[in-house]
Curated annotation (Swiss-Prot):
Name of the protein in question: Nucleoprotein
Pfam families found in the cross-reference section: Flu_NP
Motif (Unconventional nuclear localization signal): 1-18
BP-aspect Gene Ontology terms: symbiont entry into host cell; viral penetration into host nucleus
Post-translational modifications: Late in virus-infected cells, may be cleaved from a 56-kDa protein to a 53-kDa protein by a cellular caspase. This cleavage might be a marker for the onset of apoptosis in infected cells or have a specific function in virus host interaction.
Location(s) in or outside the cell: Virion; Host nucleus
Keyword list, A-Z: Capsid protein, Helical capsid protein, Host nucleus, Host-virus interaction, Ribonucleoprotein, RNA-binding, Viral nucleoprotein, Viral penetration into host nucleus, Virion, Virus entry into host cell
Length: 498
């Protein structure tokens, strides 16, 4: 992208830092994940978890959620002002699973938020370490992206469920900052904006008064974030129109839905980061690894290397396939829910199956599920190769517009074609090119029509052996061009429910 020079790298966003050189970035990202690891170890000590229990991904998720809840200022304030919510505003907790007499038992724990905040700060040199919190949010978001479908949310905002590949980060909380904004897909931003506009249509005072001014600033900021994800002048110009509208209404919703559809071929730049469960960082810190000294990157070999050497367990329900559970978590760890399955399978070294064929439900266990029949298994999170994560949509010819597939937002910077059914996508663009954005719409449709599915994206980029940490010998895979690589094909996953 042309503006790359003015942007902070997403590791800098992640660590809240100003412009730094590569070594400083690696050190500050290392400090961030090291802090998560130290916090996790301390929590395991507090809860008296055995080594095995501490490696259980369900326990990791509970501990992560506790610290996120302890630092959720807005919700804490809300709970204090609305005591009828039936929750103690000062406490947080969740299910912890322990091994007793050859069986898994669930124990509900409750902690003072103040205590959790103290442990977190202590693990992070006395700082609030917001970057580490955001990192955990992104890991949860990536897990949701791989596990649940958002058909209902898409339909509610007037979008097409086939646009699911644009929905990365749709469950990220609002407070996830710049690092969170970087990983949100085009569809996620569009959906947030549409919800806002709809509120404005239904509530006369939404844009008025002191509050309305703040709302307006938030609206324009979200528009700018979305504009920054688009890579063609016409799409950006349309975003300017949406942002500058005096009184956003149905015309803007139309424009946004048009833009979301166009992103299926003229893809936006969306960042991808490998965010791992807290227990993985905990294991490394416990074994004496010094993240800050060694440095760490979320987009290079480091997460792959960490997963090669970590043993993480998961609870498995009676009729679930452990290999499928592993696939789900592997995809979440590498933010690969929207990646082409041909590419993911090649990197992982085992075939990755579409979600409709998975015999596994989500990782988290509901409180009403019977623990007597639960088993646990090792998650297979290793990979055959590693590849650099991308933040571009994989558009060819000078990062302009090119082919896209109705269900892919590339994660790995690896050469491939992006197969797509142009007819399916173009069918959505019949007719409406009149109105104030007509010339831009016409231009966008023209670019989409000239896109060729056989064009190669990420020309010359390959995967690397795990021994090749300096990325010197790219191995460029060749893929079967005809094999469509959508994870959401024949989808039957459950909906995401808050």
């Amino acid at each position: 992208m042309a503006s790359q020079g003015t942007k902070r790298s997403y590791e800098q966003m992640e660590t809240g830092g100003e412009r730094q050189n590569a070594t400083e970035i690696r050190a500050s990202v290392g400090r961030m994940v090291g802090g998560i690891g130290r916090f996790y170890i301390q929590m395991c000590t507090e809860l008296k978890l055995s080594d095995y229990e501490g490696r259980l991904i369900q326990n990791s998720i509970t501990i992560e959620r506790m610290v996120l809840s302890a630092f959720d200022e807005r919700r804490n304030k809300y709970l204090e002002e609305h005591p009828n919510a039936g929750k103690d505003p000062k406490k947080t907790g969740g299910p912890i699973y322990r091994r007793r007499d050859g069986k898994w038992v669930r124990e509900l724990i409750l902690y003072d938020k103040e205590e959790i905040r103290r442990i977190w700060r202590q693990a992070n040199n006395g700082e609030d370490a917001t970057a580490g919190l955001t990192h955990l949010m992104i890991w949860h978001s990536n897990l949701n992206d791989a596990t649940y479908q958002r058909t209902r949310a898409l339909v509610r905002t007037g979008m097409d469920p086939r646009m699911c590949s644009l929905m990365q980060g749709s469950t990220l909380p609002r407070r996830s900052g710049a690092a969170g904004a970087a990983v949100k897909g085009v569809g996620t931003m569009v959906m947030e904006l549409i919800r806002m506009i709809k509120r404005g249509i239904n509530d006369r005072n939404f844009w008025r008064g002191e509050n309305g001014r703040r709302t307006r600033i938030a609206y324009e900021r979200m528009c700018n974030i979305l504009k920054g994800k688009f890579q063609t002048a016409a799409q950006r110009a349309m975003m300017d129109q949406v942002r500058e509208s005096r009184n956003p209404g149905n015309a803007e919703i139309e424009d946004l839905i048009f833009l979301a559809r166009s992103a299926l071929i003229l893809r936006g730049s969306v960042a991808h980061k490998s965010c791992l469960p807290a227990c993985v960082y905990g294991l490394a810190v416990a074994s004496g690894y010094d993240f800050e000294r060694e440095g760490y990157s979320l987009v290079g070999i480091d997460p792959f290397r960490l997963l090669q050497n970590s043993q993480v367990f998961s609870l498995i329900r009676p009729n679930e396939n452990p290999a499928h559970k592993s696939q789900l978590v592997w995809m979440a760890c590498h933010s690969a829910a929207f990646e082409d399955l041909r590419v993911s399978s090649f990197i992982r070294g085992t075939r990755i199956v579409p979600r409709g064929q998975l015999s596994t439900r989500g990782v988290q266990i509901a409180s009403n599920e019977n623990m007597d029949t639960m088993d646990s298994n090792t998650l297979e999170l290793r990979s055959r190769y590693w590849a650099i994560r991308t933040r571009s949509g994989g558009n060819t010819n000078q990062q302009r517009a090119s082919a896209g597939q109705i269900s892919v937002q590339p994660t790995f910077s690896v050469q491939r074609n992006l197969p797509f059914e142009r007819a399916t996508i173009m069918a959505a663009f019949t007719g409406n090119t009149e109105g104030r954005t007509s010339d831009m719409r016409t231009e966008i449709i023209r670019m989409m029509e000239s896109a060729r599915p056989e064009d190669v994206s990420f020309q010359g980029r390959g995967v690397f052996e795990l021994s090749d940490e300096k990325a010197t010998n790219p191995i460029v895979p060749s893929f079967d061009m005809s094999n469509e690589g959508s994870y959401f094909f024949g989808d039957n996953a459950e909906e995401f429910e808050n």
